[in-house]
Amino acid sequence: FSIVTCPAENTSKAMNISWGADTTITECIIEYTLARDTQWKESRTMEETSHLCTVFDKVYSKKADGTDFYEDAIFLKYEAALEELKPRREYKYRIVSERCTSDTYKFRTSGSNRWSACIIADFHVYPPLRSRLDNAMAMMDKVQEYDPGFDWVLHLGDIISWGGSYSFWQEMYEEEHFKNYMWAGVNGNHDNMSRGYIKNTNEYFKEANFYPRNGYKG
């Protein structure tokens, strides 16, 4: 799975979850509960919507060792809108299929008068230069040292060098900070582009995430 927590239109009572799964997986559900429910005894499950995603397939890209290649990225894109949540709570969730269960992910709903966020931008994930991602996560570690209780992450775009390279998104989403927070942000030009600007579309950003559809047209 390649999983990320995104904002819903009203994050005090809803949250959007996005993930990609292999096309051979026939069924996925999301299981979620309050974080304090250590044994998942009060968990709820829901089915989600899915569609076949092909927008990243055969996009010209690059591997971590510098080898040029074309992305092999046809997968099932799942979107789950968790609703009727309680404000000011920490939740956890996991993805369950007939084949495997994901790690546990967490997020906090909004609603408090006071909150804090980690703000980050322009780290341009690029596997041949792994230090870019490492340095970005190290910066977040420092923010966490200063404020262990920050609630969510705001990114200001250009977090991926080539948004059309799905393998770049996959590597980034494996990081621990993507498992513990909701990430809200905007799409920069790099998030919308493929290598060398061969193609430029916000479909890359859209299919790598699950944002509410209440923004401007397109």
Language-model segments: what does each one mean?
Residues F1-Y126, Y146:
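Acidic, histidine-bearing metal-coordination/catalytic regions of metal-dependent phosphoesterases
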Residues I17, K63, C118, L154, ...:
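Generic detector of intrinsically disordered, low-complexity, polar/charged segments
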Residues E27-C28, W40-S43, M140-K142, E175-F178, ...:
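Short, surface-exposed linear patches
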Residues D72, E79, E90-K106, S167-G218:
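Extended active-site neighborhood of metal-dependent phosphoesterases/phosphodiesterases
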Residues L133-R195:
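Core catalytic region of metal-dependent phosphoesterases/phosphodiesterases
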